[in-house]
């Protein structure tokens, strides 16, 4: 069985490949798909050029591949077309397992990130590919900038209100992807994956305080206050508005659900918030 991991030189892709190797996969059976193949040389597996914007590179990378992990692209607004190119190539190549990293409740969520993931899930379903959907909650590592800022100022400011986030470490999500790629019995499943504990931003402030050794206060912001603050910090209006919309989604509960599925897949508890933050502090 040959496994292709797209976005293999990114933060998640690297960890997926490491998890595959840790679970006994033959390095020669793994292909790291990357826009810049030179950056994949340290992964210890085969590498192939794969550029989401170059369909010919995708088709070549998929030649002879049995299973694909499509790590969702990072270019918001461009992802559906990029994902379509991979889906089409996988269908043409006769891929027998297609795994996609989606977003929580992608088909029903009002989270600003959800529409592109919903569209991608619909494309996968329409393709008829034997698929597994991994709806990943937030990565704890997403809060690296918040940790650094709070360590400097003693304040965690956000528009997330009392919303809860069932985050886990990237390694947790990467292990789940490796399990699904290597094991039988997952085709047709849509897994909602999150950490064992859904925490709020008061909890986050406390966790940051624990790892930084200084008091940290959570300061809730209105949407207007947050938008003004982000623009004052140098963000353009579009980017600032996107961040505000993300936090509004958190406030509404878009990231709060957790049912233990991630822990069951990886065979251990998910990484606690404090431990995840300690790795990036």
Regions found by a protein language model. Give the residues of each.
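Short-chain dehydrogenase/reductase
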Residues: 36, 40-44
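Rossmann-fold cofactor-recognition segment
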Residues: 44-54
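Contiguous, function-dense segments enriched for cysteine-driven chemistry
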Residues: 31-35, 51, 89, 269-281
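Conserved beta-strand segments of the P-loop GTPase G domain that flank and frequently precede/overlap
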Residues: 71
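A hydrophobic C-terminal alpha-helical subdomain
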Residues: 224-281
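Oxidoreductase cofactor-interface core, primarily capturing Rossmann-like NAD(P)-dependent enzymes
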Residues: 2-37, 53-59, 63-65, 74-84, ...
């Amino acid at each position: 069985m040959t496994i292709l991991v797209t976005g293999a030189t990114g933060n998640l892709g690297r960890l997926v490949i490491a998890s595959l190797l840790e679970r006994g996969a033959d390095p020669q059976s793994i292909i790291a798909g990357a826009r810049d193949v030179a950056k994949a040389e340290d992964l210890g597996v085969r590498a192939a050029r794969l550029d989401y914007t170059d369909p010919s590179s995708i088709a070549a990378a998929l030649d002879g591949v049995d299973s694909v992990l499509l790590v969702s692209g990072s270019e918001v607004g461009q992802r559906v077309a990029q994902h379509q190119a991979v889906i089409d190539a996988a269908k043409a190549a006769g891929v027998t397992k297609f795994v996609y990293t989606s977003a929580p409740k992608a088909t029903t969520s009002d989270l600003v990130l959800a529409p592109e993931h919903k569209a991608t899930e619909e494309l996968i379903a329409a393709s008829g590919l034997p698929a597994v959907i991994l709806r990943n909650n937030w990565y704890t590592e997403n809060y690296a900038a918040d940790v650094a800022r709070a360590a400097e100022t003693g304040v965690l400011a956000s528009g997330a209100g009392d919303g809860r986030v069932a985050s886990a470490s990237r390694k947790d999500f990467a292990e789940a992807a490796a399990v699904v790629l290597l094991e039988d019995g997952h085709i047709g499943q849509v897994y909602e994956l999150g950490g064992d504990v859904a925490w709020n931003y008061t909890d986050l402030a406390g966790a940051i305080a624990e790892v930084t050794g200084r008091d940290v206060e959570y300061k809730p912001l209105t949407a207007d206050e947050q938008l003004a603050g982000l623009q004052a910090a140098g963000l353009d209006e579009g980017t600032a508005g996107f961040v505000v919309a993300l936090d509004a989604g958190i406030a509404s509960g878009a990231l709060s659900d957790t049912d233990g599925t991630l822990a069951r897949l990886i065979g251990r508890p998910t990484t606690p918030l404090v431990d995840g933050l300690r790795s990036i502090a």
